[in-house]
């Protein structure tokens, strides 16, 4: 049997997933149980859209709970004290110059479970994140992205 996938995460990321898991188990499950009770009170289940919707929501939430439990069970937490502060790793805040758009961008490197590109949290497994890992300020990298190659210069490396 193959080994379970390890999820590289920061302490902050683990805490966030634990909070989501707790919310789903305590609050959301109760809400859905109540919705199912109300829907059952309507009688005939064959055309009961409220019941179908509540059961679908229940399936989604239970699936997410299983996913979160698996991610937390297989979490590999990055000890930021073990990584030099000037080297890009998970937990680093990296300021880069994006040559394609001629702008400075700041990324936070996180594990794939924590990625949130809209908030500049990029995964260490993404093309750009992977290209930055192990590099230092002053390094220039070229990264293959879906629409070609992007070039970045690392301006600063800090810790979150």
Curated annotation (Swiss-Prot):
Parts forming coiled coils: 12-76
SUPFAM superfamilies associated with the record: FKBP-like, GreA transcript cleavage protein, N-terminal domain
Molecular functions per Gene Ontology: DNA binding; RNA polymerase binding
Family: Belongs to the GreA/GreB family.
General function of this protein: Necessary for efficient RNA polymerase transcription elongation past template-encoded arresting sites. The arresting sites in DNA have the property of trapping a certain fraction of elongating RNA polymerases that pass through, resulting in locked ternary complexes. Cleavage of the nascent transcript by cleavage factors such as GreA or GreB allows the resumption of elongation from the new 3'terminus. GreA releases sequences of 2 to 3 nucleotides.
GO biological process, one term: regulation of DNA-templated transcription elongation
Family matches, as NCBIfam families: greA, PRK00226.1-2, PRK00226.1-4
HAMAP family: GreA_GreB
Domain of life: Bacteria
Name of the protein in question: Transcription elongation factor GreA
Pfam families per the UniProt record, alphabetical: GreA_GreB (PF01272), GreA_GreB_N (PF03449)
Keywords assigned by UniProt, alphabetized: Coiled coil, DNA-binding, Transcription, Transcription regulation
């Amino acid at each position: 049997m193959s080994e379970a996938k390890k999820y590289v995460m920061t302490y902050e990321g683990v805490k966030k997933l634990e909070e989501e898991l707790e919310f789903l188990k305590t609050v959301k499950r109760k809400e859905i149980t109540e919705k199912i009770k109300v829907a059952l009170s309507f009688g005939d289940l064959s055309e009961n859209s409220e019941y179908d919707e509540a059961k679908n929501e229940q399936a989604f939430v239970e699936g997410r709970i299983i996913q979160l439990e698996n991610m937390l069970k297989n979490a590999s937490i990055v000890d930021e004290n073990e990584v030099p502060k000037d080297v890009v790793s998970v937990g680093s805040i990296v300021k880069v110059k994006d040559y394609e758009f001629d702008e400075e961008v700041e990324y936070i490197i996180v594990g794939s479970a924590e990625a949130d590109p809209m908030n500049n949290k990029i995964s260490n497994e993404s093309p750009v994140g992977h290209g930055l890992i192990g590099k230092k300020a002053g390094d220039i990298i070229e990264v293959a992205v879906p629409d070609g190659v992007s070039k970045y210069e690392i301006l600063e490396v800090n810790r979150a």
